[in-house]
Curated annotation (Swiss-Prot):
Binding-site positions, ADP 2: 232, 332, 405-408, 432, 440, 461-462
Native source species: Bos taurus (Bovine)
A GO CC annotation given for this chain: nucleotide-activated protein kinase complex
Function: AMP/ATP-binding subunit of AMP-activated protein kinase (AMPK), an energy sensor protein kinase that plays a key role in regulating cellular energy metabolism. In response to reduction of intracellular ATP levels, AMPK activates energy-producing pathways and inhibits energy-consuming processes: inhibits protein, carbohydrate and lipid biosynthesis, as well as cell growth and proliferation. AMPK acts via direct phosphorylation of metabolic enzymes, and by longer-term effects via phosphorylation of transcription regulators.
Keywords annotated in UniProt: ATP-binding, CBS domain, Fatty acid biosynthesis, Fatty acid metabolism, Glycoprotein, Lipid biosynthesis, Lipid metabolism, Nucleotide-binding, Phosphoprotein, Repeat
Residues binding AMP 3, per UniProt: 313, 363, 368, 389-390, 461, 477-480
Modification comment: Phosphorylated by ULK1; leading to negatively regulate AMPK activity and suggesting the existence of a regulatory feedback loop between ULK1 and AMPK. Glycosylated; O-GlcNAcylated by OGT, promoting the AMP-activated protein kinase (AMPK) activity.
Any GO BP: regulation of carbon utilization
Name of the protein: 5'-AMP-activated protein kinase subunit gamma-3
UniProt: AMP 1 binding residues: 247-252, 292, 313-314
Residue ranges of the motif AMPK pseudosubstrate: 300-321
Length: 497
């Protein structure tokens, strides 16, 4: 079947004709969360054996005027996709919201300024909430891998004989840190308190659409469907067990390519005919981990902690009674929610006027990068080994010339070029038919407030930190910012755990 026919068949038989949208505030990410190895949820309701589902929570209600701007700027998963879900106002009063208490254990985290000495175990949590926040070791590639990939998983099956060496990270100057001093100033905990006082329900969309795959679907068709619908992940429905058993994400596609492309025993075109169920059985071999999720009544503070601590990009919000997926929270959505109130209602702490160089927010050492002349296969190796979701592409002089992300990899399926992973990353970027988020940069002298505004406005997952000559200095991600604004004032370092 020709690609065009396949795409038409997918859209006609698997999905509704409405332009789909995937709510992602804050992915990458991310981004990305593949729950292929996560356990069953037998209590979840059946989607009536359909491959797409539209979940609406509550009726459309009149929103207060200050939220009109959010409807105008509501992000889409990809530029150009219209019809994104509307955001639910935090001030919206409904009967359902009244049933969700906002005083949760993690929401009572003590601000750093309230104690005499900074805690040594910076990511320690109350005992009654530690289990919910860290019940799964499911990790994501960058702040959002779906499941952990053992370091020697290719070697143990004799599928990968040798891996190309990773591109060395450029040497960068050590930035002066002034963040600890800022945390002790008056008003430094304003964003922490805001996220503690609002629940996940407040940040949920009033209506959102989820694309659902049956585990009997062929892998190739599933990945084509991700591209056709502009989404990065889809829940998996097992018709035999009558339950959701995980999620399929872009990371799974990367792992398929990474595992079998150089295999002398299996051809890649044979793998694409496998069903999702077969891939799960081969790769996971029965090793399932519990689904990382959150309740609508949990605070946004807990959502931020869970995303960063577990290094995932997508956090399902599950109905506490039925177990149905109500929404998917992401780094982007959480930051957008906070940013809207920051601009209009919340006071601006003094640290927003400090420069990135002063505060040291971001990653500046041991950066994962790829040369523009390196083959795509090298980028896949780095994605898996370094667990990152995007790679700054640099030339021989160390200047940033592009950004290659995990979502770029899925377009290999759309272009049917996944049998040609020896082409260079630079060539792959030039062949890219869809304009993705691209490279947005910032410089050390820019303030934290300017960086947050740019990320929220451009709806990207990260900014590349460069000097005046476009040489790479570091990366400022959504996780870095949410950690600094929300968790650090409580003495919690989820990134460093």
């Amino acid at each position: 079947m020709e690609p065009a026919e396949l795409e038409h068949a997918l859209c006609g038989s698997l999905f509704s004709t409405q332009t789909p949208s995937w709510s992602s505030f804050g992915g990458p990410e991310h981004q990305e969360m593949s729950f292929l190895e996560q356990g069953d949820s037998t209590s979840w309701p059946s989607p009536a054996m359909t491959t797409s589902a539209e979940i609406s929570l509550g009726e459309q209600r009149t929103k207060v005027s200050r939220w009109k701007s959010q409807e105008d700027v509501e992000e889409r998963e990809l530029p150009g996709l219209e019809g994104g879900p509307q955001s639910r106002a935090a001030a919206e009063s409904t009967g359902l919201e009244a049933t969700f208490p906002k005083a949760t254990p993690l929401a009572q985290a003590t601000p750093l300024s309230a104690v005499g000495t900074p805690t040594t175990e910076r990511d320690s949590l109350p005992a009654d909430c530690t289990a919910s926040a860290s019940s799964s070791s499911t990790d994501d590639l960058d702040q959002g891998i779906e499941f952990s990939a053992p370091a020697a998983w290719g070697d143990e099956l004799g599928l990968v004989e040798e891996r190309p060496a990773q591109c060395p990270s450029p040497q960068v100057p050590v930035l002066r840190l002034g963040w600890d001093d800022e945390l002790r100033k008056p008003g430094a905990q304003v964003y922490m308190h805001f996220m503690q006082e609002h629940t996940c329900y407040d940040a949920m969309a009033t209506s959102s659409k989820l694309v659902i795959f049956d585990t009997m679907l062929q892998i190739k068709k599933a990945f084509f469907a991700l591209v056709a619908n502009g989404v990065r992940a889809a829940p998996l429905w097992d018709s035999k067990k009558q339950s959701f058993v995980g999620m399929l994400t872009i990371t799974d596609f990367i792992l398929v390519l990474h595992r079998y492309y150089r295999s002398p025993l299996v051809q890649i075109y044979e793998i694409e005919e496998h069903k999702i169920e077969t891939w799960r059985e081969i790769y996971l071999q029965g090793c399932f981990k519990p689904l990382v999720s959150i309740s609508p009544s949990d605070s946004l503070f807990e959502a931020v902690y869970t995303l960063i601590k577990n290094r995932i990009h997508r956090l399902p919000v599950l109905d506490p009674v039925s177990g149905a997926v109500l929404h998917i929270l992401t780094h982007k959505r959480l930051l957008k929610f906070l940013h809207i109130f920051q601009r209009t209602l919340l006071p601006r702490p003094s640290f927003l006027y400090r420069t990135i160089q002063d505060l040291g927010i971001g990653t500046f050492r041991d950066l994962a990068v790829v040369l523009e002349t390196a083959p795509i296969l090298t980028a896949l190796d780095i994605f898996v080994d370094r667990r990152v979701s995007a790679l700054p592409v640099i030339n021989e002089a160390g200047q940033v010339v592009g950004l290659y992300s995990r979502f770029d990899v899925i377009h290999l399926a759309a272009q049917q070029t996944y049998n040609h992973l020896d082409i260079s990353v630079g060539e792959a970027l030039r062949r890219r038919t869809l304009c993705l988020e691209g490279v947005l940069s910032c410089q050390p002298h820019e303030t934290l407030g300017e960086v947050i505004d740019r990320i929220a406005r451009e709806q990207v997952h990260r900014l590349v930190l460069v000097d005046e000559t476009q040489h790479l200095l570091g990366v400022v991600s959504l996780s870095d910012i949410l950690q600094a604004l929300v968790l650090s004032p409580a003495g919690i370092d989820a990134l460093g755990a």
